[in-house]
Structure formats: structure tokens, C-alpha cells
Amino acid sequence: MSSTGKATELQATMAVNSLLSNILPGANKMRKSNDNNNNKKNSKGTSKAQLIDRNLKRNLEIMDLDTHKFTKKNKIKKNKKIKKNVIKQNELKEIADLEIFKKHKIENNLTLSEKKKLNKIISKNLNKIKSRELDSDDQEELDDVQKFILDQTSNSQSYNKSKKRKTRRKEFKEFKNPDKNSSMDHRYPGLTPGLAPVGLSDEEDSSDEDDDRNDY
């Protein structure tokens, strides 16, 4: 449409509005009210669309976050499982080594290298074996291995304790039955040296005194 046509249309519209304003003053206001309502409807429609868009974006962000958490959780779970399997394999290997060491010890074929490995395994796992409840199918075998380990660590301690007990027993016997040559008078057994028995005769006293004079 040309600019002249637009101007003509605009003039016609203004003339109609002026006429309606003079005849029906409320007509123009109604027209404006309808325009406002349309604007409000358009604004509400736009706001609703924006709200939907924001919600969609938020849901997508939440989905991405949940996916990240799920992936991270699965990764942690997988690493724990791998670590647990590695620990289990190491324990089984140590048990197998202990069985070999046990056999060699019985046969007196335990090498120096095996002895060092045995001591290392014992020092590493002794406390853990003491405090742990074993629930595997090889319970009996593991108990046997545990007993072997405990025996290896307690042999030297038992020897020292036995030696100490023997020493204390000997000291107690010596204290209870002291040497008669050093603590008793041969003439009067059971008396403390230097004390005469009750009822000693005067003759014995005088004879002892005479002997003493003759000695001088």
C-alpha cells in the first residue's frame, strides 16, 4: 500500500473516531479498553511462555546435575569394588604363602627369604586376624593358618615366660629352704646361729668357757 493510501486510511480512521467520540463518548474508551485487554492478554501469554521456557531450562539443568551425580556415584562404587577385590586377592595370596611357609617349616626347609616374608606377613596381619571374624567358606583352613601365625609369634614369648617362672620357683625354694651350712648351727638344727637351745646345762657352759680359756 502506498503512503498516500495509508494517509487516507489514517484520516478516515481519525474522522470515524472523532464522530464516535461526539455521538458516543464511551465508544472510544471502550476501544481503548479492548486494546488494553489485548495488551494484557499478550503480556500474559508472553509471561507464560517465558515461565515455561525457564522451567524447561531448570529441568534440563537438574537432569544434567542428576546425571553427573549418578555418574560420580557409580564411579565411586566401582572404585570401591575394585579396591575390595584387590584387598581380597592380596589376602588370598598371603594365605597361600603362609600354607607354603607352614609346610616348609614342618619339613625344616624354610629359607631365609621365606622367613623374612613370613615375619612381614605376621607383623602386618596379626592384629587384623585377632580382631576379625572370618566368614568365608574356608573358615577351618583360615583358622589353622591363624593358629600357625599365633604360634610363631608366641613361641619366643612362651620360652621367656617359662624361664622366668623357673627362676622365680627356684628363688622361692631357696628362700623357703635356706642352706643349712650358712644359716643354721650344726649342733642344733633349726636354731638361728648364735642362740643356744633352752635347758642347756651349766656343765656345757663351763666346758665351753674352759675351751675358750685354753684357746687363749
From Swiss-Prot:
Residue ranges, compositional bias (Acidic residues): 201-216
Residues spanning the signal sequence: none
Annotated segments matching region Disordered: 26-51, 153-216
Keyword check for Transmembrane: no
Compositional bias annotation for Basic residues: 161-170
Any Pfam family hit: RRT14
Subcellular location(s) of the protein: Nucleus, Nucleolus
Composition bias, Low complexity: 35-48
Segments of skewed composition (Basic and acidic residues): 171-188
Listed GO CC annotations: nucleolus
Keywords from the UniProt entry: Nucleus, Transcription, Transcription regulation
Function as written in the Swiss-Prot or TrEMBL entry: Involved in ribosome biogenesis, probably through modulation of rDNA transcription.
Family affiliation: Belongs to the RRT14 family.
Protein name, UniProt field: Regulator of rDNA transcription 14
Organism: Vanderwaltozyma polyspora (strain ATCC 22028 / DSM 70294 / BCRC 21397 / CBS 2163 / NBRC 10782 / NRRL Y-8283 / UCD 57-17)
